[in-house]
Amino acid sequence: YIEAPALDAAGLDLLRSVHYEATRAGLDPQLVLGLMQVESGFRKYAVSSAGARGYMQVMPFWVKLIGRPDDKLFDLRTNLRYGCTILRHYLDIEKGDVFRALGRYNGSLGKPEYPNMVRAAWQKQWSYQKPAKLAQAGN
């Protein structure tokens, strides 16, 4: 049994916000955490060479398409709302195919590297596993 490290208030707020926005969009919160790990390394003020911003690396053009002009992409909840909405949009386009939706999200559709990185982070770092005793008991 390994005990998880204690989270500070900011860490708890991040996890709660991810859970809220992911479930609101019909996404697995652990998938969203894996995407955030790969996209920004959980850096709030990350900016890519293409101009993508924040935790989920949202491109500013999305503000004009689906948001309001005063939306701030470096705000945690705003960034998560956009990122989760965009990923849901791509999942719908790809009829639930997570691999292809991740490729669209990153702009690398058809290239396996990015979806594989997110999938690995999701499954190795963020996938919840029941302890063996609980799994055997059927809980």
Model-derived features: where do they sit?
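Catalytic glycan-binding domains that act on GlcNAc-containing polysaccharides
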Residues: Y1-N139
